[in-house]
Amino acid sequence: MSLATLDTTEHPNLPTVSTTLFKAKAARKLSFEKIGEHIGRNEVAAAAIFYGQAKPSREDIEKLADLLHIPQQPLEEQLNGFPDRGRSVEMPPKEPLIYRLYEIVQNYGYAYKAVLNEKFGDGIMSAISFSTKVEKETDEDGNNWAVITLRGKWLPFSRF
């Protein structure tokens, strides 16, 4: 099994704790799926903590420290603040997989918007009251397919 690692030269805007977390993850040979299971969160949520894009609870930090064999106190100090979301990726992204996700929004963004507006009315899908998951499907020909589910609360625009 291949594991996601971190090249800090590719990610200069990540918090310093990201390096600590990724080094420990590699040393323990853990996937984000296993880390998520251990802390009781989705694998994408676990990865978002490592990239500084999600705020872990105190319990998450305790469980991460235990699993990754990292002293809890410095980990708490480094993860205690609020995430600076959205700064970790330059736009447009250069990394091919992230660029493909960006390209999906470029190509289908207005189509998604039109269909969502027709189904829900004038509003937006929350990225705060939100969950996501990644699944792998294999078709009858043996081809692998990535299935990404985005689930966000619908927030209607207020009339004023």
From Swiss-Prot:
One of its GO terms (molecular function) is DNA binding. It is an enzyme of class 4 (lyase). Pfam families: Cyanate_lyase. One of its GO terms (biological process) is cyanate metabolic process. The active site is at 100, 103, 126. SMART domains: Cyanate_lyase (SM01116). Its EC number is 4.2.1.104. Coiled coil: none annotated. It catalyses: cyanate + hydrogencarbonate + 3 H(+) = NH4(+) + 2 CO2. CDD domains: Cyanase_C, HTH_XRE. InterPro entries: Cro/C1-type_HTH, Cyanase, Cyanate_lyase_C, Cyanate_lyase_C_sf, Lambda_DNA-bd_dom_sf. Keywords: Lyase. NCBIfam families: cynS. PANTHER family: CYANATE HYDRATASE. Catalyzes the reaction of cyanate with bicarbonate to produce ammonia and carbon dioxide. Belongs to the cyanase family. This is Cyanate hydratase. It comes from Penicillium rubens (strain ATCC 28089 / DSM 1075 / NRRL 1951 / Wisconsin 54-1255).
